[in-house]
Amino acid sequence: MTDSIRRLYDGVRAAHDQDPGSSRTARLLQAGPRKIAKKVAEEAAEGALDAAAGNRDDVVRESADLLYHLVVLWYEAGVQPKEVWAEMDRREKLYGIAEKIPKNRIVELKRPAVVPIDRARRRRAR
């Protein structure tokens, strides 16, 4: 699976320089991160609703659409697939493959260390 995501990412990168008039991906990239994020949310919602309704085949199709838009979002955000895989590997080591990282741990992991710097040192650093 990671190979197909990598190929998709490479295709998105190639589409970046294509004519938006002939490339849906180029058009989406040109629209910017807000539009791409909206499409990710839309596809996720559609897939979830299809799953709730028991429409298995539609879940498969919407999942493929979701992955496509997610990869476009990664490209737009400058995120490489290998970074996502590395994060998944890190989480697997901490919590196991089928567990999601607890919300309170996410906050702890994202919170930067605050180191007080006196004003004199700050002025010298400029």
Predicted regions located by residue number:
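Flexible "arm" and connector segments at domain edges
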Residues: 1-62, 68-126
